[in-house]
From Swiss-Prot:
GO biological process: clathrin-dependent endocytosis of virus by host cell; fusion of virus membrane with host endosome membrane; fusion of virus membrane with host plasma membrane; viral budding from plasma membrane; virion attachment to host cell
Entry protein name: Hemagglutinin
Miscellaneous comment in the UniProt entry for this protein: Major glycoprotein, comprises over 80% of the envelope proteins present in virus particle.
Lipidation (S-palmitoyl cysteine): 566, 569
Keywords, alphabetical: Clathrin- and caveolin-independent endocytosis of virus by host, Clathrin-mediated endocytosis of virus by host, Disulfide bond, Fusion of virus membrane with host endosomal membrane, Fusion of virus membrane with host membrane, Glycoprotein, Hemagglutinin, Host cell membrane, Host membrane, Host-virus interaction, Lipoprotein, Membrane, Palmitate, Signal, Transmembrane, Transmembrane helix, Viral attachment to host cell, Viral envelope protein, Viral penetration into host cytoplasm, Virion, Virus endocytosis by host, Virus entry into host cell
Membrane topology, from the record: Single-pass type I membrane protein
Membrane-side (Extracellular) residue stretches: 19-533
Residue spans crossing the bilayer: 534-554
Subcellular location: Virion membrane; Host apical cell membrane
Record family assignment: Belongs to the influenza viruses hemagglutinin family.
Function field: Binds to sialic acid-containing receptors on the cell surface, bringing about the attachment of the virus particle to the cell. This attachment induces virion internalization of about two third of the virus particles through clathrin-dependent endocytosis and about one third through a clathrin- and caveolin-independent pathway. Plays a major role in the determination of host range restriction and virulence. Class I viral fusion protein. Binds to sialic acid-containing receptors on the cell surface, bringing about the attachment of the virus particle to the cell. This attachment induces virion internalization either through clathrin-dependent endocytosis or through clathrin- and caveolin-independent pathway. Plays a major role in the determination of host range restriction and virulence. Class I viral fusion protein. Responsible for penetration of the virus into the cell cytoplasm by mediating the fusion of the membrane of the endocytosed virus particle with the endosomal membrane.
Record PTM: Palmitoylated.
Site (Cleavage): 349-350
């Protein structure tokens, strides 16, 4: 009877399951890997791509005043070759140059071409004003078959001045223009290099020719260089164009005695615009702010890996194809073993039997928040998210992407590589500088993202620790930590009690007496792992000693009774 009572009491004691509350974090089965300052490939619950790779192969022009120059080159709008007749004056905030576009008709070139192209791309369009030049003693209707309309003609905005008669004397002339506007005036003139000395004499008379141009900030003299050259558009001569920006109230003066291509109208810039050289099709159904030769980049990301020469409000170009920005906490998913044994463990060890600590693992079922609680008591088991700590972490992480964009986005200008021979060294420097900037920004981008990722992971761990400390301070001596993010509570804690722990309203004094009594009972029979090891070794040693003593005793008795004989041979 006494034995039966002892067995029942022992069984009841073993079946009692202590109330417990655990803290954990949200986890997913498959997270996203990010890099930090100290480690590569850390898995996080959420991450956002920061490098745009999707290109729209069209020029998105919705909401923009767009001009497609077609066969007209941008510089041609200032001098007026036949292909640019419809673009002599225009207004636009998006200027599209095509590869087929040409700036000239009579062969030649622009001095400092790329600088002028950049000015016009940002111009917002151009308007013109007549300069008021009149001429006597010369012809002003020079024309060429290279600039054909219905017949031979010339640049619409220029005057080709010739002697009144072939081989006739070209008089010395001086013409001045004062800019009375409030904005700078673009003044363009040309120097004609004849195909031969004989041709120059026929057009402008004999003798040396000299053209001098000056203003308050500019002075330059030009001498034509007649001579044979390869024919282009049927012409062996060349016209080189020069330009200056004339400040308000400043005056430009031209002094010449032949071989001078005179300006007819001054150009004024209208405002601001973007200019891009592209053969992509225009699309009025999409909007864009960032353009490149292959189309449009539409993105809110801070970086792009599409084109290093995109212009407008563009993400920074970087060499990396992907830079993941952590927007969630470090992910430690529940392992597959736990998933397979969940039901078995719950029966055998309770809800928490297969769950590692809040630092070592996460809970995939915690979907209402980033941090939360799981508990077990006499009323059952339950899970609840902690919204305050979740919101605190979210508030600090929200805006990380926007802050990266603010640090990296800027308006870019496109500088072409189409430099003439004189400008090639400058072009090489520009290209080297661009490549160096890309290298620097690629490194900076990786560093910025790594810093933000490090901060995010440290931040989310910090919030978890704060939550853990909050629970520990409430429970005090009423519970014991198990080292896995759980607290074993030494008193009965129903659902209301568990809720008070979560809500930070737990009154430890209310349960102190019961907790102390239960702690004493448990501590009386609890053996730590260190004591268990000592007892096991002691028990093993005692067993071995006892076995050896019994064996020696049996041998001694057998020898004494003559049942065993021991012979020693030397």
């Amino acid at each position: 009877m006494n034995t039966q009572i002892l067995i029942l009491a022992t069984s009841a004691f073993l079946c009692v399951r202590a109330d417990k509350i655990c803290l954990g974090r949200h986890a997913v089965s498959n997270g996203t890997k990010v890099d930090t300052l100290t480690e590569k490939g850390i898995e996080v619950v959420n991450a956002t791509e920061t490098v745009e790779q999707k290109n729209i192969p069209k020029i998105c022009s919705k909401g923009k005043q767009t001009i497609d120059l077609g066969q007209c080159g941008l510089l041609g709008t200032t001098i007026g070759p036949p292909q640019c007749d419809q673009f002599l004056e225009f207004s636009a905030n998006l200027i599209i140059e095509r590869r087929e576009g040409d700036d000239i008709c009579y062969p030649g070139k622009f001095d400092n071409e790329e600088t002028l192209r950049q000015i016009l791309r940002k111009s917002g369009g151009i308007k013109k004003e007549n300069m008021g030049f009149t001429y006597t003693g010369v012809r002003t209707n020079g024309e060429t078959s290279a600039c054909r309309r219905s017949r031979s003609s010339f640049y619409a905005e220029m005057k080709w001045l010739l002697s009144n008669t072939d081989n006739g004397v070209f008089p010395q002339m001086t013409k001045s223009y004062k800019n009375t506007k409030r904005e700078p005036a673009l003044i363009i003139w040309g120097i004609h290099h004849s195909g031969s000395t004989a041709e120059q004499t026929r057009l402008y008379g004999s003798g040396n020719k000299l053209i001098t141009v000056w203003s308050s900030k500019y002075q330059q003299s030009f001498a034509p260089n007649p001579g044979p050259r390869p024919q282009i558009n049927g012409q062996s001569g060349r016209i080189d164009f020069y330009w200056l920006m004339l400040d308000p109230n400043d005056t430009v003066t031209f002094s010449f005695n032949g071989a001078f291509i005179a300006p007819d109208r001054a150009s004024f810039l209208r405002g601001k615009s973007l200019g891009i050289q592209s053969d992509a099709q225009l699309d009025n159904n999409c909007e864009g702010e960032c353009y490149h030769i292959g189309g449009t980049i539409i993105s809110n990301l801070p970086f792009q890996n599409i084109n290093s020469r995109a212009i407008g409000k563009c993400p920074r170009y970087v060499k990396q194809k992907s830079l993941m920005l952590a927007t969630g906490m470090k992910n430690v998913p529940e392992n597959s073993t736990h998933k397979q044994l969940t039901h078995h463990m719950r029966k055998k060890r309770g809800l928490f039997g297969a769950i590692a600590g809040f630092i070592e693992n996460g809970w995939e079922g915690l979907i209402d928040g980033w941090y939360g609680y799981r508990h077990q008591n006499a009323q059952g088991e339950g899970t609840a998210a902690d919204y305050k700590s979740t919101q605190s972490a979210i508030n600090q992480i929200t805006g990380k992407l926007n802050r990266l964009i603010e640090k990296t986005n800027q308006q870019f200008e496109l500088i072409d590589n189409e430099f003439n021979e004189i400008e090639k060294q400058i072009g090489n420097v520009i290209n080297w500088t661009r490549d160096s900037i890309i290298e620097v920004w690629s490194y900076n981008a990786e560093f910025l993202v790594a810093v933000e990722n490090q901060h995010t992971i440290d931040l989310t761990d910090s919030e978890m620790n704060k939550l853990y400390e909050k629970v520990r301070r409430q429970l005090r001596e009423n519970a014991e930590e198990d080292g896995n993010g759980c607290f074993e509570i030494f008193h009965q804690c129903d659902n209301d009690c568990m809720a008070s722990i979560r809500n930070n309203t737990y009154d430890h004094k209310k349960y102190r007496k019961e907790a102390i009594q239960n702690r004493i009972q448990i501590d009386a029979v609890k053996l730590s792992s260190g004591y268990k090891d000592i007892i096991l070794w002691f028990s093993f040693g005692a067993s071995c000693f006892l076995f050896l003593a019994i064996a020696m005793g049996l041998a001694f008795i057998c020898i004494k009774n003559g049942n065993m004989r021991c012979t020693i041979c030397i």
